[in-house]
């Protein structure tokens, strides 16, 4: 049917229609090819913003480094990274003066975290640069490889399982004269297959030892691998993001813990909270400014945008901040926290896979690895690439580029927010000593600035002063991209404020639809998304009902499970029709078995199996919820599962949904082809970890499982737990004397094995 789109907006206030202009429907753009070009751009831009700084050479790695700190004061509006140490320290001091005890308390909280955090904290997160293999790996594998190499090089503090002890090993590894690592490689040989008598290629995975000297090891330890950021909407150009290795991660985690603790205590900070909590926090700041600007004052709000936030931040500045924040704390704590910014001042950016290179005349495609860019003849490249390579050449060492200034995306979100808030905090009248004053909101690089003054000149003066103050700490407010409005209408982190936050529903659009996990989870996630949007995002009843019908339709097409009495023919219809005819109570069939949909907006909170349980035929119940059903490999059953949903911006969110395990909760098997690649050893390691962890959890059900304190290993903990449980079971008569004796014997055997090993 034809709809004139303007009709949709006749009754809608303009600010509510804003969300229709967002680029959120359809698939987001993904990048292809290597990120080498984007990374070079980042490195070159970062150096350009700091070009008037001082050049030095790192004595350990020989890397040239640019230090813009306390560089020339800006004379124009170009973005620059010349932060002034004394200005940053003054902002910190005033932040503390206006929030007495904030740094002290946050340090105490962080110290407690530092002493308790286990090394497995580092297994969270997705792809991580694995310095032993010089490429990306899942975080858990990268950590395991690092620990394995550390131990074989005599670094054993990590065996306590505490993150802080692992970090002691990292520090020690940097003082060693060299490190021996194990790398994986593939051997191919042609052999004759006994069965078919044909020649086949046989691949075997070899491990070989390799020695890295001190310089090579340090370069790897300080390396951030780079990739292209995928799925960014509303942009034409892609950009590079970084993933640090295990040596850096632990230190960054502690710094961010401290900064997070500070952000929680600052009313202007948009981190670390999110969603409705964030909206409430921000609405408070706006309310304060509007209430205080009585009839005599004007109040304006800038929807702010900063130019290249990360590339103008500087790790040396963060070091100054940390030194100030922790100034009355014990020496060991100050040292642990200062290592992350020091490592970042000496970081190296890995240029990724290299350049794809095609020659039209010779019909040739080849990839030039990043390592070769330092000395390849530039006549093969086009003009723009040539410029890029020429600029970056002086910085190259072993295929990585020395990148001292700048921060790389997403590394110190919390700490950079603290810096931003400290400038917003300088807007109080008792500090500015003028008729104007300001306040605002900060969330990583996004900000909103609210300026109050008796007249327009005052507003202009306030904005100018804010702009200049920012420049002094390496923050560059973009005059082109920021815009000013009467307070009451602004945008901050894609929340639109119009006398209260209006729901920006289009941001949730990508999470509607069928997820593709399995029939059971998809149904549950689909209705939960609709339910959550009715609660949080002004999804009205009529629209929700329509969304539900569209979802069911989508679901049936995805899994080819149209109702048993439909005319639609698919490859499943024969079986589903048969089931439909055999079933007495047809309303009891799940939608995925060709049943009718019983969901409406009043019962979205009930899992489908529960909704239909009373309506099901008895034999259908027996087949559906049968743990012995051979066609289903069951996970351990939890009542709540976590799905990853993709909102339109920000990282993928985890969303809880009710999980009722049925024969529809299947788990697809791993693709076999990985088993023939060099990844195979890694896969086996992963499975071994999985088995150990599962076994451990069997001994310590989550209710009683507190992280082990002290140095007992997993095995010791399990053995002692088994003994205690056996004794309790024996004394209460749950097990016989013989069984008790057998358990004790097994425990002793295990301990004996450990001693021999």
UniProtKB/Swiss-Prot annotation:
Coiled coil: none annotated. Residues 249-256 are annotated as: Promoter-binding site. A motif (Nuclear localization signal) lies at residues 187-195, 203-216. PROSITE patterns: RDRP_SSRNA_NEG_SEG (PS50525). Phosphorylated by host PRKCA. Keywords: Eukaryotic host gene expression shutoff by virus, Eukaryotic host transcription shutoff by virus, Host cytoplasm, Host gene expression shutoff by virus, Host nucleus, Host-virus interaction, Inhibition of host RNA polymerase II by virus, Nucleotide-binding, Nucleotidyltransferase, Phosphoprotein, RNA-directed RNA polymerase, Transferase, Viral RNA replication, Viral transcription. GO terms for molecular function: nucleotide binding; RNA binding; RNA-directed RNA polymerase activity. InterPro entries: RNA-dir_pol_NSvirus, RNA_pol_PB1_influenza. Residues 286-483 form the RdRp catalytic domain. It catalyses: RNA(n) + a ribonucleoside 5'-triphosphate = RNA(n+1) + diphosphate. Its EC number is 2.7.7.48. Residues 55-64 have a biased composition (Polar residues). One of its GO terms (biological process) is viral transcription. RNA-dependent RNA polymerase which is responsible for replication and transcription of virus RNA segments. The transcription of viral mRNAs occurs by a unique mechanism called cap-snatching. 5' methylated caps of cellular mRNAs are cleaved after 10-13 nucleotides by PA. In turn, these short capped RNAs are used as primers by PB1 for transcription of viral mRNAs. During virus replication, PB1 initiates RNA synthesis and copy vRNA into complementary RNA (cRNA) which in turn serves as a template for the production of more vRNAs. Belongs to the influenza viruses polymerase PB1 family. This is RNA-directed RNA polymerase catalytic subunit. It comes from Influenza A virus (strain A/Swine/Hong Kong/126/1982 H3N2). The lineage of its organism: Viruses, Riboviria, Orthornavirae, Negarnaviricota, Polyploviricotina.
């Amino acid at each position: 049917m034809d709809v004139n789109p303007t009709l949709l907006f006749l009754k809608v206030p303009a600010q509510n229609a804003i969300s229709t202009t967002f680029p959120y429907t359809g698939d987001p753009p993904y990048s292809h090819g290597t990120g080498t070009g984007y990374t070079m751009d980042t490195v070159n831009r970062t150096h350009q913003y700091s070009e008037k700084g001082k050049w030095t050479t790192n004595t350990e790695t020989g890397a040239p480094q640019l230090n813009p700190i306390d560089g020339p004061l800006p004379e124009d509006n170009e973005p620059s990274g010349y932060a002034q140490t004394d200005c940053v320290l003054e902002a910190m001091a005033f932040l503390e003066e206006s929030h007495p005890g904030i740094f002290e308390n946050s340090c105490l909280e962080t110290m407690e975290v530092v002493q308790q955090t286990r090394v497995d904290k580092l297994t969270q997160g997705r792809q991580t640069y694995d310095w032993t293999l010089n490429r990306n790996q899942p975080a858990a594998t990268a950590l395991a490889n690092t620990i394995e190499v550390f131990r074989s090089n005599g670094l054993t503090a990590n065996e306590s399982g505490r993150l802080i002890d692992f970090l002691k090993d990292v520090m020690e590894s940097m003082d060693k004269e060299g490190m021996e690592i194990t790398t994986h490689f593939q051997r191919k040989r042609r052999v004759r297959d006994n069965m078919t008598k044909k020649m086949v290629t046989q691949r075997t995975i070899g491990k070989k030892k390799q020695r890295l000297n001190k310089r090579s090891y340090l370069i790897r330890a300080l390396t951030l691998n780079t990739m292209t950021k995928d799925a960014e909407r509303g942009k034409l150009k892609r950009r590079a993001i970084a993933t640090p290795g295990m040596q850096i991660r632990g230190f960054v985690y502690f710094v961010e813990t401290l900064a997070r603790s500070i952000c929680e205590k600052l009313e202007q900070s948009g981190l670390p909270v999110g969603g409705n909590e964030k909206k409430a926090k921000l609405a408070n700041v706006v309310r304060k400014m509007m209430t205080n600007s009585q009839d005599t004052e004007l109040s304006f709000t800038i929807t702010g945008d900063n130019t290249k936030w990360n590339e103008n931040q500087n790790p040396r500045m963060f070091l100054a901040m940390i030194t100030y924040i922790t100034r009355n704390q014990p020496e060991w704590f100050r040292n642990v926290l200062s290592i992350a910014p020091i490592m970042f001042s000496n970081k190296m950016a890995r240029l990724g896979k290299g350049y794809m290179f095609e020659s039209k005349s010779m019909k040739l495609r080849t990839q030039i690895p990043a390592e070769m860019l330092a000395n390849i003849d530039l006549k093969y490249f086009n003009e723009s690439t040539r410029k890029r390579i020429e600029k970056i050449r002086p910085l190259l060492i072993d295929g990585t580029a020395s990148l001292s200034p700048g921060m790389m995306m997403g590394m110190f979100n919390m700490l950079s927010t603290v810096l931003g808030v400290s400038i917003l905090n300088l807007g109080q009248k008792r500090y500015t000593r003028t008729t104007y004053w300001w306040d605002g909101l900060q969330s990583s690089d996004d900000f909103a600035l609210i300026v109050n003054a008796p007249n327009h000149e005052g507003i202009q003066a306030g904005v100018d002063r804010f702009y200049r103050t920012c420049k002094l700490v390496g923050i560059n407010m973009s005059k082109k991209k920021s815009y000013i409005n009467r307070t009451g209408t602004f945008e901050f982190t894609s929340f639109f404020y119009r006398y209260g936050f209006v729901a920006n529903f289009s941001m949730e659009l990508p999470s509607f639809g069928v997820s593709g996990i399995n029939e059971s989870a998809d149904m549950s996630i689909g209705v939960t998304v609709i339910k959550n949007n009715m609660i949080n995002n002004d999804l009205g009843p009529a629209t929700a009902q329509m969304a539900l019908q569209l979802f069911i339709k989508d679901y049936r097409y995805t899994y080819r499970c149209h109702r048993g009495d439909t005319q639609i023919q698919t490859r499943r219809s024969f079986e589903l029709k048969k089931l439909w005819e055999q079933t007495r109570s047809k309303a009891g069939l799940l939608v995925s078995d060709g049943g009718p949909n019983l969901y409406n907006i009043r019962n979205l909170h009930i899992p489908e199996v529960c909704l239909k349980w009373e309506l099901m035929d008895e034999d259908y119940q027996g087949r559906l919820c049968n743990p012995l059903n051979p066609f289903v490999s069951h996970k351990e059953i939890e009542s709540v599962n976590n799905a990853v949903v993709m909102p339109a911006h920000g990282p993928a969110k985890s969303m809880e949904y009710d999980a009722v395990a049925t024969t529809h909760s299947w788990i697809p098997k791993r693709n076999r082809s990985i088993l023939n690649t060099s990844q195979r050893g890694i896969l086996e390691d992963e499975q071994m970890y999985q088995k150990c962890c599962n076994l451990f959890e069997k001994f310590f059900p989550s209710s009683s499982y507190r992280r082990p304190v002290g140095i007992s290993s997993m095995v010791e903990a399990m053995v002692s737990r088994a003994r205690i449980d056996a004794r309790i079971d024996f004394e209460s008569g749950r097990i016989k004397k013989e069984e008790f004796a057998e358990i004790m014997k097994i425990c002793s055997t295990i301990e004996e094995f450990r001693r021999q090993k």
